[in-house]
Amino acid sequence: MNLIQILEQEEIARLNKTIPSFAPGDTVIVNVNVVEGTRKRVQAYEGVVIAKRNRGLNSGFTVRKISSGEGVERTFQTYSPLIASIEVKRRGDVRRAKLYYLRERSGKSARIKEKLPSRVKAAAVAA
């Protein structure tokens, strides 16, 4: 590992953010700190992760949602101080890393199947 990677890992450890593991296709709720004048509030942004970019400290992900009939995409930096928290609402079962094809789809064709826990794991947890 080179010096830059070591520095990035130290910076990530210093930030001390708990980021859940999520993948493209998952529905997430991103709580964003919004500053309006002197007021600071938390705004929830819920949508489907259509892309994820793993670059250490520069990692990011794109979330797409439908707001009043119009598709809205927002790209977040994973370790940004503007992100208060990330919560995974549901896991999606997809076969692609980038789900840009969802931009052209609407309605039922834009649905993503839910990834159910495997029966082997469920049986092991129950036992």
From Swiss-Prot:
GO cellular component assignments: cytosolic large ribosomal subunit
| Molecular function as annotated in GO | structural constituent of ribosome
Q: Please name the SUPFAM superfamilies in this protein's record.
A: Translation proteins SH3-like domain
Disulfide bonds, paired cysteine numbers: none
What sections of the protein cross the membrane?
Answer: none
| Keywords per UniProt | Ribonucleoprotein, Ribosomal protein
The record's annotation in PANTHER family points to: LARGE RIBOSOMAL SUBUNIT PROTEIN BL19M, RIBOSOMAL PROTEIN L19
Q: Which family does it belong to?
A: Belongs to the bacterial ribosomal protein bL19 family.
The protein, known as: Large ribosomal subunit protein bL19
Source organism of this protein record: Acidovorax ebreus (strain TPSY) (Diaphorobacter sp. (strain TPSY))
> Which gene codes for it?
rplS
